[in-house]
């Protein structure tokens, strides 16, 4: 109730295995009791991470990896509460089966860090899975690495290593992708710049557009252009200099899109 009174959602993390990534207890063979407990607590969001499942996994076939996610989906469906279900990354091409396993969103790549080469590698890969995006079903390229962050495995909290321009590009691309906008920073200590990034109504409107149209990537000789059609018939277009070159914009080519 306290979390909800602040206007926030209550998210929780678990694994289909006996343990989680952090070596805490997972939900293996306790799916229904965990789902009921989360419902009673008022949980709004579940990230169900593949970590730990390797200990009991029979093989690496897609069917085997998908199975425990279906078990948890069935358990959540028995709870009298809507809990958004994120299928954690655990297999190649997760976007091909996560929807059928009951996920509303699914992690598409490795964990993100606040390094520009990692952000661009993850973001620019999303055209491979873009067609899986639809209203209520979303590719998740991982959280936004803005603000004060802690690196993996509890390392010291620090300011994002991304430059301001890199952060603009990071959030802009995630919005064009209709990606979930999850922040991993310290919410009690957000600076004005980070707050301005996270509260830009025009950019958020692109992310939240009702159509959730899959984004399209166009390659140029010296950059990338991403675009998607919006509900009102207009287009959101993003220009991204992944490498230190200029992008040349031709209005005739733009109208041909």
Describe these PLM feature segments.
Residues 30-33, 82-186:
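Glycan-recognition surfaces
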């Amino acid at each position: 109730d306290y979390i909800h009174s602040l206007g926030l959602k209550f998210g929780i993390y678990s694994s289909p295995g006996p343990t989680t990534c952090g070596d805490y207890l997972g939900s293996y063979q306790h799916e229904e009791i965990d789902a009921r407990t989360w419902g009673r607590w008022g949980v709004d969001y579940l990230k169900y991470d593949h970590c730990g499942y390797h200990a009991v996994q029979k093989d690496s076939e897609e069917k085997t990896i998908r199975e425990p996610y279906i078990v948890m989906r069935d358990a959540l469906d028995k709870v009298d509460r809507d809990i958004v279900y994120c299928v954690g990354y655990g297999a190649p091409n997760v976007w091909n089966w996560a929807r059928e396993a009951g996920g509303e969103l699914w992690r598409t790549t490795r964990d993100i860090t606040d390094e520009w080469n990692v952000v661009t590698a993850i973001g620019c890969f999303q055209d491979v899975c873009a067609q899986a995006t639809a209203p209520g079903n979303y590719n998740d390229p991982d959280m936004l690495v803005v603000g004060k962050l802690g690196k993996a495995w509890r390392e010291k909290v620090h300011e994002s290593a991304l430059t301001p321009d890199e952060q603009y590009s990071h959030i802009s691309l995630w919005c064009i992708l209709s990606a979930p906008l999850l922040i991993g920073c310290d919410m009690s200590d957000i600076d004005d710049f980070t707050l301005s990034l996270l509260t830009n109504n025009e950019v958020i409107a692109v992310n939240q557009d009702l159509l959730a149209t899959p984004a399209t990537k166009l390659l140029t000789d010296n950059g990338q252009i991403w675009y998607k059609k919006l509900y009102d018939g207009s287009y959101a277009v993003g220009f991204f200099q992944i490498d230190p070159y200029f992008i040349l914009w031709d209005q005739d080519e733009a109208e041909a899109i």
